[in-house]
């Protein structure tokens, strides 16, 4: 348990989250599990899914740097504040793409992102989710824990990624 907690804190750092983020998510999830009356097996799976939800987060770091010409930590941290509106997305991209590059290179990056943005976002999320699920299985966690980690970015309404589950 202490080892998993330490790993969870390390995942918070690699995802650009404040220390204890996954632990807080886990606490909230366990409160919901109590209210829902989940059995002990389901609670165990939920507990580890939430503590380790970001297992795959470092798998897309190099790709973020390659695509956006920026460091992945500030990119991931700051993207959490984007609400999805076009204005916020454009502002975010202008602030984070090619930060230390010349205008021409930054413009090239932005143009590619505008053209291929949805595909690139799917690629990044799919890589993260698949890698996280694989790591969970490699660590000996159940298929349910791996599936929960794989579904990290799914939304209740079907608008999430990588599969658009509802």
Residue ranges and their predicted role:
Residues 1-166:
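Histidine- and acidic-residue-rich, metal-dependent catalytic cores
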């Amino acid at each position: 348990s202490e080892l998993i907690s330490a790993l969870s804190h390390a995942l918070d750092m690699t995802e650009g989250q404040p220390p204890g983020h996954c632990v807080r998510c886990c606490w909230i999830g366990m409160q919901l599990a109590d209210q829902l009356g989940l059995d002990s097996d389901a609670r165990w799976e939920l507990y580890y899914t939430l503590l380790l939800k970001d297992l795959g987060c470092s798998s897309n770091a190099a790709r973020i740097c390659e695509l956006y010409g920026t460091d992945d930590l500030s990119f991931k941290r700051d993207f959490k504040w984007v609400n999805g509106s076009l204005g916020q997305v454009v502002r975010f991209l202008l602030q984070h793409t090619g930060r230390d590059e010349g205008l021409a290179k930054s413009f090239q990056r932005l143009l590619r992102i505008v053209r291929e943005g949805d595909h690139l976002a799917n690629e990044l999320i799919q890589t993260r989710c698949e890698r996280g699920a694989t790591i969970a299985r490699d660590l000996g966690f159940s298929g349910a824990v791996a599936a929960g980690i794989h579904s990290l970015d799914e939304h209740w309404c079907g608008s999430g990624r990588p599969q658009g589950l509802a």
